[in-house]
Amino acid sequence: MKHVHIFTDGACSGNPGPGGWGAVLRYGDVEKEMSGGEAETTNNRMELLAAISALNALRQPCEVDLHTDSKYVMDGISKWIHGWKRNGWKTGDRKPVKNGELWQALDEARNRHNVTWHWVKGHAGHPENERADELARKGMEPFKKARRADAVK
C-alpha cells in the first residue's frame, strides 16, 4: 500500500466570507498541490474541504499521514464523529451536526484509506503547513476579488 503524507489548511476572510482551502500531497519525492474556494463559507468548512479533497484525490487505498492545524477537524474526526454517527448525525442535544454533509463526506473519504491524523501548530514555521496555508489563500483570492468588485458597483 502506498504511503502518502497530506498537509491541509483552510482560510477565510470574514467568518462567514470568502474562503479557500489548500493541500499538499506527497508520495516519495512526488508532490501535488491542490486548492479551491467558495464565495461565502466558514473557516471550518474550508478546513474540512481541504481534507476531503486531498483524500478523494488518491486513486487507490493508501496509508495516509494527514497533518492539519485545525483542532475542529482533529476533535471531530477523533472524538465527536462516533457519537454523531450513532445519533444519526445529530449532536448530544439532538440538533443536526454543523457541516454534517462535509463530516459525512470526510468519513467516507477516510474509510477508503488507512489514515493517521496529526495536529500541527498553525503559523509556527512548519514548511508544508505554511505551503498549505498559501494554497488556501490562493484558493480564496478569486472570491475576495469578486467581493471587492461587487462593493465598488
From Swiss-Prot:
GO terms for cellular component: cytoplasm. It comes from the Bacteria. GO terms for molecular function: magnesium ion binding; nucleic acid binding; RNA-DNA hybrid ribonuclease activity. Residues 123-153 are annotated as: Disordered. Its cofactor is Mg(2+). Binds 1 Mg(2+) ion per subunit. May bind a second metal ion at a regulatory site, or after substrate binding. The keyword NAD does not apply. GO terms for biological process: DNA replication, removal of RNA primer. SUPFAM superfamilies: Ribonuclease H-like. CDD domains: RNase_HI_prokaryote_like. InterPro entries: RNase_H, RNaseH-like_sf, RNaseH_domain, RNaseH_sf, RNaseHI. It is found in: Cytoplasm. It catalyses: Endonucleolytic cleavage to 5'-phosphomonoester. Gene3D superfamilies: Ribonuclease H-like superfamily/Ribonuclease H. Residues 125-153 have a biased composition (Basic and acidic residues). Residues 1-141 form the RNase H type-1 domain. The keyword Transmembrane helix does not apply. Mg(2+) 2 binds at D9, D133. Keywords: Cytoplasm, Endonuclease, Hydrolase, Magnesium, Metal-binding, Nuclease. Mg(2+) 1 binds at D9, E47, D69. Its EC number is 3.1.26.4. Endonuclease that specifically degrades the RNA of RNA-DNA hybrids. Belongs to the RNase H family. Monomer. This is Ribonuclease H. The gene is rnhA.
